[in-house]
Amino acid sequence: MARWGLLLDNPDRHGEYRPMELLDTVDGTRESAEAQLRELVRLYLPSRPRKPKRTRIYRTADGWAMICDGAAGQSFAYRFMLCELEWDSGPADEPKTVWQ
C-alpha cells in the first residue's frame, strides 16, 4: 500500500523561501489521496489576502493551484501537491494529520 503526502507550497510574494507544509498523509490508492487533497483544497482558508475578492482553483498534473485576489489588487498563489512517499529514514508508523 502506498503512502501519500499532501503538501502545500506557498512561496512568498517577494521571492523569499518558505518551506513546504505537510498537510496530511494518506495510506491507500492515489485516487483516495486525491480525494482527500481535493477536499483540503476546497476547505483551505489562506492567510493572504486578508480581504479576498475572488478565489480560483485550477487542476494541475500533480494537484491543484489556488489563486486568491485581494481587495487591494494583489494576487496570492498556493500550490497543493500529491506526492508518493518513496523512502523514509524514520520508523514505520501510522500517518499523522498535521493540518487542522
Where would I find each of the regions flagged by the language model?
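Short aromatic-glycine-(Arg/Gly/Cys) micro-motifs in beta-strand/loop hairpins
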Residues: 1-22
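Generic "edge-of-domain/loop-turn" microfeature
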Residues: 13-15, 31, 73, 87
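Hydrophobic/aromatic beta-strand elements that line small-molecule binding cavities or substrate pockets
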Residues: 24-25, 55
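Short beta-strand-to-loop capping motifs
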Residues: 25-28, 68-70
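A short, charged, amphipathic alpha-helix used as a generic interaction element across diverse proteins
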Residues: 27-51
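Short, mixed-charge low-complexity intrinsically disordered segments
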Residues: 43-100
